[in-house]
């Protein structure tokens, strides 16, 4: 729904729409809604209209949320002023949006677990900072307050020796030997999914936590609040889907190196495993088995009979894995 339609209905900054809490200010719309149990999905855009994309999330059953919009009063410069604060509760998760648009998330015990980093002075730096780019979208920087003692785990597979990611900056992009999965768990009792496919960066600083997307039309993240990692992962899987069971061969012993140059070299290794009576599920011939880049056939100068090779491996109970 657009800003214009909201303005026709009410002058309030907040609106309860079906099972969601919505805030609008200037051209920005913020929408918070339940997405599975004990979780809240937060979206925002400066364009005045949110997309209908679910991205990595499944369209699962939404829990019934409790939404409250409260009027509050303060005296400033001798004048009584009215403002609104809104709340949405889904199981363990409670989000508050204050008069300045700052979002704070609490657990079921009322403990603060995540808070946007809004800086009103001196530059009025927003927590949700959208900067127009040349692609017709925005470069987005999302900033949160940081607990220096918090421990953070996850985010996929990186070539770093750190289990606790506190103090790390991670590139959110896939590379050879790097698989970026923008989901982390905190020892403060929550899981967080950055639900955007854009290339970007995540920084888990001691003074601030930041997520950056190089090009996007909106902000989108999911926060799951639970007491144990098991509960967090269970809700996370309900939200994004469950991985199928791997085939049996994939759970066996793999042999790989960088790389096998010829068919004879690979088969000599496979036959030696058989001679030693070591079960071999997969042997990976790896890259550059092809004649030219982009032509991913076997190079017959070095791999003269791939069919015969594959059949012999199959008789051994071994699969020939190759890249790509």
Q: What do the PLM-derived regions correspond to, one by one?
A:
Residues 293-318:
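Aromatic-lined substrate-binding rim segments of carbohydrate-active enzymes
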Residues 1-250, 256-258, 263-265, 269-271, ...:
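N-terminal accessory segment at the very beginning of proteins
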Residues 275-276:
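Ser/Thr/Asn(+Pro)-rich, low-complexity disordered segments
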Residues 286-292:
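Short, conserved phosphate-binding/catalytic loop or strand-edge motifs used
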């Amino acid at each position: 729904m657009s800003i214009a339609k909201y303005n026709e209905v009410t002058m309030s900054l907040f609106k309860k729409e079906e099972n969601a809490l919505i805030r609008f200010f200037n051209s920005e719309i913020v929408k918070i809604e339940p997405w599975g149990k004990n979780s809240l999905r937060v979206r925002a855009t400066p364009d005045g209209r949110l997309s209908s994309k679910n991205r990595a999330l499944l369209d699962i059953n939404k829990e019934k949320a409790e939404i409250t919009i409260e009027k509050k009063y303060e005296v400033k410069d001798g004048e009584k002023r009215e403002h609104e604060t809104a709340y949405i509760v889904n199981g363990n998760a409670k989000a508050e949006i204050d008069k300045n648009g700052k979002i704070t998330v609490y657990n079921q015990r009322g403990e603060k677990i995540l808070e946007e980093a809004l800086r009103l002075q001196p530059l009025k730096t927003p927590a949700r900072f959208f900067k127009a780019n040349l692609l017709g979208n925005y470069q987005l920087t999302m900033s949160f307050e940081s607990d220096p003692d918090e421990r953070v785990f996850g985010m996929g597979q990186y070539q770093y020796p750190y289990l606790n990611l506190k103090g790390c900056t991670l590139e959110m992009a896939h590379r050879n030997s790097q698989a970026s999965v923008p989901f982390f768990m905190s020892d403060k009792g929550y899981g967080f999914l950055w639900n955007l496919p854009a290339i970007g960066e995540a920084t888990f600083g001691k003074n601030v936590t930041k997520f950056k997307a190089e090009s996007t039309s909106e902000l989108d993240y999911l926060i799951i609040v639970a007491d144990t990692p098991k509960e967090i992962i269970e809700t996370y899987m309900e939200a994004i889907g469950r991985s199928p069971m791997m085939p049996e061969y994939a759970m066996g012993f793999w042999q790989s190196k960088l790389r096998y140059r010829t068919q004879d070299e690979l088969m000599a290794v496979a036959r030696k495993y058989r001679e030693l009576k070591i079960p071999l599920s997969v042997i990976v011939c790896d890259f550059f088995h092809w004649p030219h880049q982009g032509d991913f056939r076997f190079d017959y100068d070095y791999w003269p009979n791939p069919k015969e090779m594959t059949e012999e491996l199959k008789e051994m109970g071994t699969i020939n894995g190759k890249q790509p």
